[in-house]
Amino acid sequence: YWMPGLGGKALWENHARNTARVLNAINPHYIRSRPFHAWPGTPMHNAIQMNEYQMLSPDEQLRELKLTIRELDVTAHVCFDHAGNYWKNRHGALLFTHSYEGYKFPQEKQTVLDLIDEGLKAGNQKSTFMRL
Protein backbone atom coordinates (compact mmCIF):
# COMPACT_ATOMS: atom_id res chain seq x y z
CA TYR A 1 0.00 0.00 0.00
CA TRP A 2 1.01 3.57 -0.55
CA MET A 3 -0.57 6.65 0.94
CA PRO A 4 -0.66 9.69 -1.37
CA GLY A 5 -0.88 12.93 0.57
CA LEU A 6 0.86 11.71 3.73
CA GLY A 7 3.67 14.26 3.36
CA GLY A 8 1.23 17.15 3.34
CA LYS A 9 1.99 20.46 1.66
CA ALA A 10 5.49 20.67 3.13
CA LEU A 11 6.81 17.27 2.06
CA TRP A 12 4.65 16.11 -0.86
CA GLU A 13 7.48 16.10 -3.40
CA ASN A 14 9.88 14.20 -1.12
CA HIS A 15 7.08 11.78 -0.29
CA ALA A 16 6.33 11.17 -3.99
CA ARG A 17 9.96 10.61 -4.99
CA ASN A 18 10.79 8.44 -1.98
CA THR A 19 7.64 6.37 -2.43
CA ALA A 20 8.62 5.66 -6.04
CA ARG A 21 12.21 4.89 -5.02
CA VAL A 22 11.14 2.36 -2.38
CA LEU A 23 8.49 0.75 -4.60
CA ASN A 24 11.04 0.46 -7.42
CA ALA A 25 13.45 -1.31 -5.06
CA ILE A 26 10.76 -3.71 -3.83
CA ASN A 27 9.01 -4.18 -7.20
CA PRO A 28 5.89 -5.70 -5.60
CA HIS A 29 3.23 -7.59 -7.54
CA TYR A 30 0.53 -5.10 -6.45
CA ILE A 31 0.68 -1.45 -5.41
CA ARG A 32 -2.54 -0.13 -3.87
CA SER A 33 -3.31 3.55 -3.35
CA ARG A 34 -4.90 4.54 -0.03
CA PRO A 35 -4.95 8.35 0.07
CA PHE A 36 -4.13 9.87 3.42
CA HIS A 37 -7.07 10.92 5.57
CA ALA A 38 -6.65 12.17 9.14
CA TRP A 39 -9.33 10.67 11.36
CA PRO A 40 -10.63 12.75 14.29
CA GLY A 41 -8.89 11.99 17.55
CA THR A 42 -5.59 10.97 15.93
CA PRO A 43 -2.31 12.87 16.40
CA MET A 44 -2.32 13.85 12.70
CA HIS A 45 -5.84 15.25 12.94
CA ASN A 46 -4.78 17.24 16.01
CA ALA A 47 -1.75 18.59 14.09
CA ILE A 48 -4.08 19.75 11.32
CA GLN A 49 -6.36 21.46 13.83
CA MET A 50 -3.34 23.28 15.30
CA ASN A 51 -2.05 24.31 11.82
CA GLU A 52 1.10 22.24 12.31
CA TYR A 53 0.30 20.14 9.24
CA GLN A 54 -1.48 21.11 6.02
CA MET A 55 -3.25 18.45 4.01
CA LEU A 56 -3.11 18.43 0.22
CA SER A 57 -6.14 19.43 -1.81
CA PRO A 58 -7.46 16.79 -4.24
CA ASP A 59 -5.64 18.50 -7.14
CA GLU A 60 -2.42 18.61 -5.11
CA GLN A 61 -2.84 14.89 -4.40
CA LEU A 62 -3.15 14.30 -8.14
CA ARG A 63 0.09 16.23 -8.73
CA GLU A 64 1.77 14.03 -6.13
CA LEU A 65 0.33 10.94 -7.80
CA LYS A 66 1.65 12.11 -11.16
CA LEU A 67 5.18 12.51 -9.83
CA THR A 68 5.10 9.12 -8.09
CA ILE A 69 3.69 7.33 -11.14
CA ARG A 70 6.11 9.07 -13.50
CA GLU A 71 9.05 7.83 -11.43
CA LEU A 72 7.78 4.26 -11.01
CA ASP A 73 9.80 1.62 -12.85
CA VAL A 74 8.03 -1.57 -11.81
CA THR A 75 6.34 -4.64 -13.23
CA ALA A 76 3.25 -4.50 -11.04
CA HIS A 77 -0.47 -3.88 -10.92
CA VAL A 78 -1.14 -0.35 -9.66
CA CYS A 79 -4.60 -0.24 -8.08
CA PHE A 80 -6.96 2.53 -7.03
CA ASP A 81 -9.55 0.15 -5.54
CA HIS A 82 -10.44 2.09 -2.39
CA ALA A 83 -13.23 4.63 -1.80
CA GLY A 84 -10.58 7.20 -0.87
CA ASN A 85 -9.52 7.33 -4.53
CA TYR A 86 -12.38 9.72 -5.22
CA TRP A 87 -10.92 11.94 -7.95
CA LYS A 88 -13.27 12.67 -10.85
CA ASN A 89 -12.89 13.27 -14.57
CA ARG A 90 -14.50 16.18 -16.46
CA HIS A 91 -17.74 14.19 -16.78
CA GLY A 92 -18.04 13.64 -13.03
CA ALA A 93 -17.18 9.93 -13.19
CA LEU A 94 -14.45 8.32 -11.10
CA LEU A 95 -11.04 8.99 -12.61
CA PHE A 96 -9.58 5.53 -12.01
CA THR A 97 -11.14 2.11 -12.24
CA HIS A 98 -11.71 0.62 -8.78
CA SER A 99 -10.74 -2.83 -10.05
CA TYR A 100 -8.70 -5.07 -7.76
CA GLU A 101 -6.41 -5.79 -10.71
CA GLY A 102 -5.79 -2.12 -11.44
CA TYR A 103 -3.43 -1.04 -14.18
CA LYS A 104 -0.59 -3.26 -15.42
CA PHE A 105 2.78 -1.53 -15.33
CA PRO A 106 4.76 -0.71 -17.32
CA GLN A 107 2.23 -1.37 -20.12
CA GLU A 108 -0.50 0.94 -18.77
CA LYS A 109 1.70 3.54 -17.09
CA GLN A 110 0.98 6.16 -19.77
CA THR A 111 -2.75 5.47 -19.42
CA VAL A 112 -2.56 6.29 -15.71
CA LEU A 113 -0.55 9.46 -16.40
CA ASP A 114 -3.15 10.50 -18.99
CA LEU A 115 -5.95 9.86 -16.49
CA ILE A 116 -4.17 12.02 -13.91
CA ASP A 117 -3.90 14.82 -16.48
CA GLU A 118 -7.63 14.42 -17.16
CA GLY A 119 -8.31 14.73 -13.43
CA LEU A 120 -6.19 17.86 -13.20
CA LYS A 121 -8.16 19.40 -16.08
CA ALA A 122 -11.39 18.54 -14.25
CA GLY A 123 -10.37 20.62 -11.25
CA ASN A 124 -10.78 18.29 -8.27
CA GLN A 125 -10.77 21.13 -5.76
CA LYS A 126 -13.10 19.80 -3.10
CA SER A 127 -12.72 16.54 -1.29
CA THR A 128 -15.69 14.26 -1.74
CA PHE A 129 -14.22 11.64 0.57
CA MET A 130 -16.99 10.26 2.72
CA ARG A 131 -16.34 9.46 6.34
CA LEU A 132 -17.15 5.86 7.14
Predicted regions mapped to residue ranges:
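Conserved radical SAM core fold
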Residues: W2-G7, A38-G41
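Auxiliary Fe-S-binding modules of radical SAM enzymes
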Residues: R17, R21-L132
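Canonical radical SAM enzyme core domain
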Residues: P4-N18
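Long hydrophobic alpha-helices with heptad-repeat/coiled-coil character
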Residues: M3, L11, A25-H29
